Amino acid sequence: MPVVTLYWDELERLVGADRDTILSRLPMLGCDIERVEDDHVDVEFFPNRPDLYSVEGVARALRGFLGIEKGLKSYSAVKGEWKITVEESVLAVRPRIVGCVVKGIRMTDEVIRSLMEVQEDLHWTIGRNRRKMAIGVHDLSKVYFPLRYKAVDANFSFVPLDFDREMTVAEILEEHPKGKAYAFILEGKDSYPMIVDSKDEVISFPPIINAEKTRVTEETTDLFIDVTGFDENVDRAIAILACMLADRGGRIESVEVVYPDHVELTPNLDVRFMEVDVDEVNSLLGLSLSAEEIKESLEKMRFSCEIEGEKLKVGIPPYRADIMHEWDVIEDVAIGYGYENITPEIPPTLTFGRTHPWNDIRSLAKEIMIGLGFTEVITFTLTNEAVMYEKMRRKGEPWKDYVPVMHPLTTEHTILRTSLLPKLLELLSYNKHHEMPQMVFEVGDVVVNSKNRLHLAACITHSRANFSEIRSYVQAVMRELDLTWEVRESDDEAFIDGRRAEIVVDGKAVGVFGEVHPEVLEGFELTMPVSAFEIDLSAFFDTGELL
């Protein structure tokens, strides 16, 4: 989780309260105070509140929480004469771009420091280390509109930030510090995203580095900000940055982004509205709050609220992209009301618990795998059909017995996983630039036919990963689990024919192992061989083997 450094002189001035008051109330917003020094405080915030990664965002929240300035703060973008044209060539590389212009900013050391820190924190969290989203900040006076967002080849050249000579894209990825750090994002690509202005001069090479010519200095008063990526994370980031700089007195102007098939006006600073039921609030929190008390709590959390009988019409500020459900609003009601004001109650009945057998086998499996030299990872339970089936060459039963997500917010999270292996391969693809060999495993739930199953999966990748190696690890796992097993031929298309096998216990297939098929490796953009196995641990409870 990101740790944000907040300097006392600036924080006290922006909030309008003394440090003792701030220190006593800050943890109530949902953060941990890591360190308190004479000139600053280090605060760790949860990843679900990226709007709090800057001193401006924290001050905004505290002013409401302390009752200094309650309710929804209005933000708007003036329609500007700024335009970005997105060319067809870049859509297959990094398809989304948004932008905004900020005028009238005094770029003091404090503002520059805050902007750089929030930029990197956003890169690390919602940007997934720039893979999903990357931000560029430029001196507007050096940018000549209209801009073009296009793809170029590796021989394209410009002067990157912190250099005084032209470098080709290939040279930047091999020699520039930022290029070497983030080259993995574009690995395997034969074209690269580039933002150029009307003079055909480069503004930015996202997600790697800006051009030297648009460097921001203390003399800068007007900014152009671009955010590139793949999904709605670019909209979240630009809204957070625009609101942050508006709080510094900046005038926000919109940028028109022209795609081949549609036009967008960014940033979108519109207020979203959500209906919240008073009874649902009290039922979930175990309280008996009136509509007026709920409204008071929400206004302290910087929402607007209108009472409409037993319903509340809640206005959500543009920087709160974490609010996706009625319960998210109710959580903020609890924070605004004050957890310290909620009286703990002893349950009316007393029961004694014990660990679930699944947790016992989960712990044992982890102990075995760590002892074999594997590194444990935890991947998302939500995934999509492309990762789970298409890239794995898997069709039909049982791989289609998945649970879909109703009204998914992104195309990446449309179903619950039915197998652990695809997510491990996806993880390896993100880490292929690291040293080999790589040995990873996961013990986790999958959902098949609407029922949870406990699986163990592992992958090995290096230049000589093979069937014999992965079989030796399967043998070790089954020996440590004290299970008698045998091997029979598998027809799992994710593995190479003749180098794949089923794990059979009491005549029932409980797992599979082998060398991953080259087409699967290509789908995940993996360049090294991979051998893998997956075992359904819950099958042993079905048969009584591990009870």
From Swiss-Prot:
GO terms (BP aspect): phenylalanyl-tRNA aminoacylation
Keyword Electron transport appears in the UniProt entry: no
InterPro entries documented for this protein: aa-tRNA-synth_II/BPL/LPL (IPR045864), B3/B4_tRNA-bd (IPR005146), DNA-bd_dom_put_sf (IPR009061), Phe-tRNA-ligase_IIc_bsu (IPR045060), Phe-tRNA-synth_IIc_bsu_arc_euk (IPR004531), Phe-tRNA_synthase-like_B3/B4 (IPR020825), Phe_tRNA_ligase_beta2_arc (IPR022918), PheRS_beta_core (IPR041616)
Subcellular location: Cytoplasm
Listed cofactors: Mg(2+)
Enzyme superclass (EC): ligase
A GO cellular-component term linked to this record: phenylalanine-tRNA ligase complex
Keyword Magnesium part of the UniProt annotation: yes
Domain of life: Archaea
Keywords from the UniProt entry: Aminoacyl-tRNA synthetase, ATP-binding, Cytoplasm, Ligase, Magnesium, Metal-binding, Nucleotide-binding, Protein biosynthesis
N-terminal signal peptide: none
Annotated GO MF terms: ATP binding; magnesium ion binding; phenylalanine-tRNA ligase activity; RNA binding
Binding site for Mg(2+): D322, D328, E331, D332
Enzymatic reactions: tRNA(Phe) + L-phenylalanine + ATP = L-phenylalanyl-tRNA(Phe) + AMP + diphosphate + H(+)
Domain B5: 269-344
Protein EC: 6.1.1.20
Family: Belongs to the phenylalanyl-tRNA synthetase beta subunit family. Type 2 subfamily.
Assembly mode: Tetramer of two alpha and two beta subunits.
Name this protein carries in UniProt: Phenylalanine--tRNA ligase beta subunit
Organism of this sequence: Archaeoglobus fulgidus (strain ATCC 49558 / DSM 4304 / JCM 9628 / NBRC 100126 / VC-16)
Lineage, opening ranks: Archaea, Methanobacteriati, Methanobacteriota, Archaeoglobi, Archaeoglobales
